[in-house]
Amino acid sequence: MPLIYVDTLEDPRLDAFARLTEAQLRSKLEPERALFIAESQKVIERAFEGGMEPISLLMEEKWLPSMAPLIERMEERAGMRPGGEGLPVFMAPHDELERLTGFELTRGALGAFRRPALPTVADVLHEARLVAVLEDITNHTNVGAIFRSAAALGVDAVLVSPACYDPLYRRAVRVSMGTVFQVPWTRIGDENVPNRSGCGTWSNEGIAELHEHGFTCAAMALSDDSMTPDELSALLAARETASG
């Protein structure tokens, strides 16, 4: 693996970690160049095990021994030969990494990964029995927490509405502890249709699509007449300020 030592985050090779905004990382106009950032060794490992393609790593040197086996696996899967070009691994001072992340980076490293193309709804629902649908969740921390809960509860897949915040946003990935790479997910509904009154909503076609796949749609609420999701079920979680 090539080790690249940098003294400052101003190095242009670290743009993906230090300067690109989330919108720039997503690169909608050039999706083949889109990236996302994973923080901590555990999340990086889960991203890799979830089939994500690593582009480069950034860490403090003391974490290299614990990361080395994972880096070796990354290079092996990419067909990189030992002693060859390898996966770029940037080494930065502790203070610079703390300044970048905004907190004490006690769990190792950051990884830049290629953002994958989203699967179709049909692909995600294949063999799924319990699905969570996130409608317009507009808080990245909540998105990550819901994915973590979904993984713990055995949810088979997650569908997110067009206006729901991005599950691959850096904070969402971190809060999810990498479960966004373990639970299959995709977008449902037409992203080009504004999700506001009078302009149509994702549910016009999205709910029908779920019904076509045999799912019963149920809102998540405390109620005496609540159902038990014994059959194919899609649990709908609305945005934080929704009522009714």
Where is each model-derived feature located?
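Glycine/small-residue-rich loop that forms an oxyanion/phosphate-binding "nest" at active or ligand-binding sites
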Residues: 72-79, 87-106
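RNA substrate-binding interface of SAM-dependent RNA methyltransferases
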Residues: 4, 42, 49, 81-86, ...
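Short active-site oxyanion
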Residues: 32-35, 53-56, 86-88, 157-158, ...
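Short basic, glycine-rich beta-strand/loop surfaces that mediate nucleic-acid
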Residues: 108-112, 174, 240-244
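A general structural signal for well-ordered alpha-helical segments in protein cores
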Residues: 13-17, 44, 97, 106, ...
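Boundary-proximal intrinsically disordered activation/regulatory segments immediately upstream
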Residues: 1-68, 72, 164-165
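A contiguous loop/helix-start segment that scaffolds small-molecule binding in enzyme catalytic cores
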Residues: 229-244
